[in-house]
Design a protein with these regions (language model features):
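A generic structural micro-feature
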Residues: 23-25, 72, 85-87, 112-116, ...
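Beta-strand/loop substructures that line and gate deep hydrophobic ligand-binding cavities in soluble
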Residues: 96-97, 107-164, 170-172
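Short beta-strand segments that buttress and anchor functional surface loops
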Residues: 78-85, 105-111
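Sec-exported extracytoplasmic/periplasmic mature domains
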Residues: 47-57, 85, 97-103, 168-176
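Short, surface-exposed coil-to-beta transition loops
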Residues: 28-30, 88-93, 116-121
Length: 176
């Protein structure tokens, strides 16, 4: 009986390790919403990292969040570093591409609670009636340790729910 239990445990562990090993080595999380405002009104809220305080879901998770800005106020080269509690972590982001009223691409470097180097992207598409479809995506490599963690935690749900909240906040800020 004891040997059977040990065998089942070993098989389960090997199954988890094997599943993580064959999982994709890149990830992409994406959410979309429509905002009743033109791209020219939505774009500055994304392209100016100082404006993120008004809508980023992570800003509200740590009232004592430490922020620092560097580079230009907005657009390519604008950077934002943060240091916060366990929910927010520590990291840096820098705008690497900025196409007025159309696209913002950001290099994301997380140091804590885990190290990761990803890309975030905002695409703005004008819609009929003066509204804007905004797509917020994050993508990057998924090393083995992250894939192993994803066996137990659905990162798309965890991060995607924050993107949903952020897009709702962005919508509220842009529609004022």
């Amino acid at each position: 009986m004891f040997k059977a239990i040990i065998a089942i445990i070993v098989i389960a562990i090997l199954g988890v390790l094997g599943y993580a090993a064959i999982s994709p080595d890149h990830f992409r999380i994406e959410r979309t919403t429509t905002i009743a405002a033109p791209p020219e009104k939505v774009f500055p809220l994304i392209n100016d990292l100082h404006q993120w305080k008004a809508w980023s879901p992570w800003e509200k998770l740590d009232p004592a969040l430490k922020r620092s800005y560097s580079g230009p106020k907005e657009g390519v080269g604008a950077a934002y570093s943060w240091q916060g509690n366990n929910e927010v972590g520590t990291g840096r982001m820098e705008i690497t591409q900025s196409e007025p009223a159309s696209k913002v691409e950001i290099k994301l470097d997380f140091q804590m609670p885990f190290e990761a180097h990803n890309t975030a992207e905002f695409n703005l598409q004008p819609q009929n009636g003066g509204s804007t479809q905004v797509t917020w995506a994050m993508y990057g490599p998924s090393p083995y340790t992250h894939r192993l963690m994803q066996v137990f935690f659905d990162m798309d749900d965890m991060v995607g729910s924050k993107f949903d909240q952020g897009l709702m906040n962005l919508k509220a800020a842009a529609e004022k």
